[in-house]
Swiss-Prot record:
Cofactor (UniProt): pyridoxal 5'-phosphate
InterPro entries: Aminotrans_V_dom, NH2EtPonate_pyrv_transaminase, PyrdxlP-dep_Trfase, PyrdxlP-dep_Trfase_major, PyrdxlP-dep_Trfase_small, SP_NH2Trfase/AEP_transaminase
Protein's name according to its UniProt entry: 2-aminoethylphosphonate--pyruvate transaminase 2
Highest taxon, organism lineage: Bacteria
Gene: phnW2
Organism listed in the record: Paraburkholderia xenovorans (strain LB400)
Record Pfam families: Aminotran_5 (PF00266)
Protein keywords: Aminotransferase, Pyridoxal phosphate, Pyruvate, Transferase
Catalytic activity, EC: 2.6.1.37
Keyword Transferase applies: yes
Residues with the N6-(pyridoxal phosphate)lysine modification: 194
Gene Ontology MF term list: 2-aminoethylphosphonate-pyruvate transaminase activity
Homology family: Belongs to the class-V pyridoxal-phosphate-dependent aminotransferase family. PhnW subfamily.
Length: 370
């Protein structure tokens, strides 16, 4: 699927993009140009449709990586006197805590193992033990292991207890079903360079309109103030500060391809096929996934590193990279692992080819897996 000699990025973002998406960045756009502003509006409208949020939600785009959007959402939506429950089963959950610490917002950490999904019962127990909790910051797909946390059950318990739910859907948006009509979710955060198969550089937050309109002056940051961004864009149709024009154009093209493929169901099905092909081929080489199948998301798979003394990730990475595939280092704290992504403009055959390249690298380096 990839022309030329570009490497295949088996990472959770940036990821391999289609030629059409790259070609969309060949045109320059004026940041105040009416055509560009219409494109931004269309992109936001399409993002809302993916999660069925057209009626009660708004989509606010923001320059920068997904973490910029996460910090913007927390700073804009959580009052200074609020208290945020953070279920923590990985590095990206821990990042939420670091953001809250920097902003001086109170939080309660729900500590979980790196292979343990959060449960609605555990969240409800935290509500019962800590009445001061006002918000929950929940990572839908913890990319450090590829762990899928439940969403609908968490949303239901938050709604039942009157808690505001902010969801980091960075690595699930577009690949896994999310339906805002079911209720319980106040904000949803993602970015251009993940499962939508755009390029990095634009985050976005989908929020209940009523909550955003009540958040004026709350953000401690000028650049990350989503209320200010929303009001300015409504008034002028323009971004407050220089927009990532080429990123928006690439996302526009990527969304067109997303729709032509069949939307979220088709995108998710392709990624599931990719994941199944990868896991099967890697098991044949002797590798074992870190997660159980029932909690494995079809986005990135974490594998246990070989125990062979000849194993060194840097040398292994370089050998696989030489064959045209870029892997991802492990991000777990307890065991040595590495990760292989299943997403991007690739199919199951590409994952089988990648596994073959991994097998050749093991032979070349004299590494025994079993």
């Amino acid at each position: 699927m990839i022309p030329g000699n570009d490497p295949i990025l088996l990472t959770p973002g940036p990821l391999t993009t289609s030629l059409r998406t790259r070609e969309a960045m060949l045109r320059d756009w004026g940041s105040w140009d009416a055509a560009f502003n219409r494109m931004t509006h269309g992109v936001c409208a399409d993002l809302l449709k993916i999660v069925h949020g057209e009626n009660d939600y708004v989509c606010v785009p923001l320059q920068g990586s997904g973490t910029f959007a996460v910090e913007a959402a927390l700073g804009t939506l959580v009052p200074r006197q609020g208290c945020v429950l953070v279920p923590n089963n990985g590095a990206y959950c821990a990042r939420l805590i670091r953001i809250l610490q920097r902003m001086g917002i109170a939080y309660i950490e729900l500590v979980l193992r790196e292979d343990e999904p959060v449960s609605a019962a555990a969240v409800e127990d935290a509500f019962n033990r800590h009445s001061r909790i006002s918000h929950v910051a929940h990572v839908h797909l913890e990319t450090s292991a590829g762990l899928l946390n439940p969403l609908d059950d968490i949303a239901a318990v938050c709604q039942r207890h009157g808690k505001s739910l902010i969801v980091d859907a960075m690595s699930s948006f577009g690949a896994l079903p999310i339906d805002l009509r079911r209720g319980g979710i106040d904000a949803l955060i993602s970015a251009s360079g993940k499962c939508l198969e755009g390029v990095p550089g634009m985050g976005f937050v989908i929020m209940r309109r009523s909550l955003l309109e009540d958040s004026e002056g709350r953000s401690p940051s000028l650049a990350l103030d989503l209320h200010d961004q929303y009001v300015y864009m409504r008034k002028t149709t323009q971004w407050r500060f220089t927009p990532p024009t080429h990123v928006v154009a690439a996302l526009r093209e990527a969304l067109d391809q997303f729709g032509a493929e069949g939307g979220q169901p088709a995108r998710g099905a392709r990624y599931a096929r990719n994941c199944a092909a990868l896991v099967g081929a890697m098991k044949a080489l002797g590798f074992e996934p870190f997660l159980k199948p029932e909690v494995q998301a079809p986005v990135i798979v974490t594998f246990h590193a070989p125990r062979d003394p000849a194993w060194h990730f840097a040398a292994f990475y370089a050998a696989v990279r030489e064959a045209g595939y870029v892997l991802y280092p492990g991000k777990l704290t307890q065991v040595e692992t590495f990760r292989v992504g299943c997403i991007g403009a690739i199919d199951a055959n590409e994952l089988l080819n990648a596994a073959a390249a991994i097998g050749h690298a093991l032979e070349r380096l004299g590494i025994r897996v079993r």
